Regions:
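Short acidic, low-complexity intrinsically disordered linear motifs used
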Residues: 224-238
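OB-fold ssDNA-binding interfaces and closely related basic DNA-contact patches used
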Residues: 1-82, 87-101, 116-168, 172-190, ...
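Polyanion-binding surfaces on beta-sheet-dominated domains and ring/shell assemblies
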Residues: 129-130, 195-213
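Low-complexity, polybasic segments enriched for Lys interleaved with small residues
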Residues: 212-226
Length: 238
């Protein structure tokens, strides 16, 4: 049985396995520096049993690592950058943390990161869908209850709506401009992640042999902070 190390392409949401050399079933990828590498794309997402979660330090910063077992017996580590370049929680990581308290170790799920932008949308909807799955045929279990997410606090039409997660606070900067203060939100979600990890019966094994990517998998800072959504992110057309 193999150990598989998976990353997420921020721009597409695709889960991929990286290789420096050409491999059967892999696609060519050329980064912004012109360096070619190869990727095996998991277009259906990752179907796997959740075995553990950890925070790992890498040369490029902290990552959330999901330790999972695939239906064929392979161990898959699905890694997400924890912070963006402004030290806010990265989009995929934040989405994943909001659903972690509803997940169970030993349960099988489909993990599907997404980055969706409609023709008339100004900003993309970025996150991670997690639903119960059947590993024997890599399918979503139809009719199964979806894991619930922590809810956001927000203000709409001057009405404050209280949720689980503290609201983003807008403050006036020294030059009169408005700046976003996400510290309370970030701390709450970071504490939620650590509480989930602390509650696990066992820790995920170390990823000593993780292959180094050709470029740092940095999560870009969003051009605009993602507004809390009232609709369930997992009501997706896939």
């Amino acid at each position: 049985m193999a150990n598989i190390y998976l990353q997420v392409d921020y721009k597409t949401g695709n889960i991929f396995q990286f290789s420096k050399t050409i491999q059967e079933g892999y696609e060519s990828h050329i980064n912004t520096k012109g360096t070619e590498s190869w990727r095996k794309i998991y277009k259906k997402g990752l179907y796997a049993k959740l075995e553990g979660v950890s925070i790992r330090d890498t040369d490029f910063g902290k990552e959330i690592s999901l330790y999972t077992k695939m239906g064929n017996g392979d161990t898959a580590y699905l890694n997400f950058p924890l912070f963006d370049q402004k030290k806010n929680l990265a989009s995929y990581a934040e989405s994943l943390i909001t659903i972690l308290p509803s997940l169970k170790v030993g349960e099988s799920y489909r993990f599907f990161p997404y980055n969706i932008k409609g023709d008339n949308d100004k900003y993309a909807n970025v996150g991670v869908s997690v639903v119960l799955a059947d590993l024997s045929n890599e399918s979503v279990i139809e009719g199964a209850a979806k894991p619930t997410r922590l809810s956001y606090s927000y203000t709409k039409n001057d009405i404050a709506v209280k949720g689980d997660i503290p609201a983003i606070v807008w403050e006036e900067d020294f030059d009169g401009s408005r700046t976003m203060n996400s510290k309370a939100k970030n701390k709450f979600l970071y504490d939620t992640l650590n509480a989930f990890i602390a509650g696990l019966s066992g820790s995920a094994p170390a990823q000593a042999s993780t292959p180094a990517p050709t470029a740092a998998p940095k999560a870009p800072a969003p051009k605009k902070p993602a507004a809390p959504v009232e609709a369930e992110n997992d009501d997706l057309p896939f």
